[in-house]
């Protein structure tokens, strides 16, 4: 890579020039939300190695929304949220004079949405230099609440940030009524549909999933920022034990994302001209060769099936097309990994297998590296940046996912200088229209009669099987959602027997739909 190759980069080309990650395991003594963003942002600014004080040049501060600030969620944490304008709070904490304050909506796809937005504004000469930060301090927050300690975490600097992203609840009232809200209860529905597609028994699928996630935990074991830096075997991950209880059939605890973490990340993006003016070494420069965001059919109950994702396919196709490379030419990969089915659906759409020699994560994934709420992809991209800085000319792919395999993002990154006019955020409007207008299965909220199980899960509490969730089809193929009777006999039966494609009867009891196996 020559000096001349960097000189061919247009002034308004966006470049990622700094990043930092922080993991705080001090429990109840840990950082609050503002502190954990402030500390990591300071380090990201230092990482740029600017020859001129960078702080004075940051004109935009963007923050990924925190879980405790999630609309539509009634919880102790959301009721205690005390940062009405976190971008301004962060700007003030860092003594910046940023004129643009941006806050994202809910979703694990938010970091890619933010990068796309910031990159386009740099390209259009609307902004010059942006700081993007995100993370969680839930371990400290929840720990203090449980111990009865004060949580006076608040700062109100005035003003309202600009909101970017789609702010719509991930489920409708009918889905929520039947238990489709907590991700740990929804992603297992995709898992059982996947094993039906692959012709796997429950045990075979759990073993296959254990092998997939053993590879992830191995990466996490070598990551100094990982919340759980432990290499677990496939057997450890798949085997149900008191310390690894079933959460939602077929997923054990070790297959679930861990969100109660204190982790944060910050990334600095600016125009190539600004990077040159500030004397930032070209060895720090990483280019976003393409970025794309697109949604699947919004509601889970309306999906065509539960083993594929038209949006992931279109999203990743679009970033490869814009970057003018194929998946085979990517050297580093990070697939969003909140639950195994999120990875497996993406693998299917990208034609990847679990033993790909490149690996499918650069961090270790959300169950092992940690799942800092909506901000995880910040960490995967920061990790990707560092790998690419040490691998001149190589490419990396990072994917993102919000809600329930609902909202998707993808980005391709490289240290290879981008030459020519930068216009690398995909226009997905036509693709989105095609997905939204697809023929959805007929659905009824009040099913009655004979039926067949399309997919299902048994949600477990610490005391054992607690609730059955069934998505099924009536004889005329009309889809429905139902619960099962909460008797121990029924729940134990459903926990032991493979219920896929089995028959039963469904009816409405006046409150919700109830499925009874034959």
What is each PLM-predicted segment?
Residues 54-65, 100-106, 131-134, 204-212, ...:
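Beta-strand segments within the central parallel beta-sheet cores of soluble alpha/beta enzyme folds
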Residues 105-136, 181-222, 267-274, 322-325, ...:
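Active-site-proximal alpha-helical scaffold in enzymes
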Residues 2-37, 156-181, 187-215, 247-307, ...:
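Condensing-enzyme catalytic core mediating Claisen C-C bond formation in acyl metabolism
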Residues 43-59, 94, 316-329, 353, ...:
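Phosphate/pyrophosphate-binding loops at sites that engage ATP/ADP/AMP, CoA/4′-phosphopantetheine
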Residues 34-52, 86-87, 307-323, 380-384:
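Short, well-ordered amphipathic alpha-helical segments that serve as non-catalytic structural scaffolds
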Residues 222-282, 321, 328-348:
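Accessory "access/gating" subregions that flank catalytic or transport cores
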Residues 10, 25, 65, 69-129, ...:
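Conserved catalytic cysteine-centered active-site region
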Residues 489-507:
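Short nucleic-acid-contacting surface segments enriched for D/E, G, S/T with interspersed K/R
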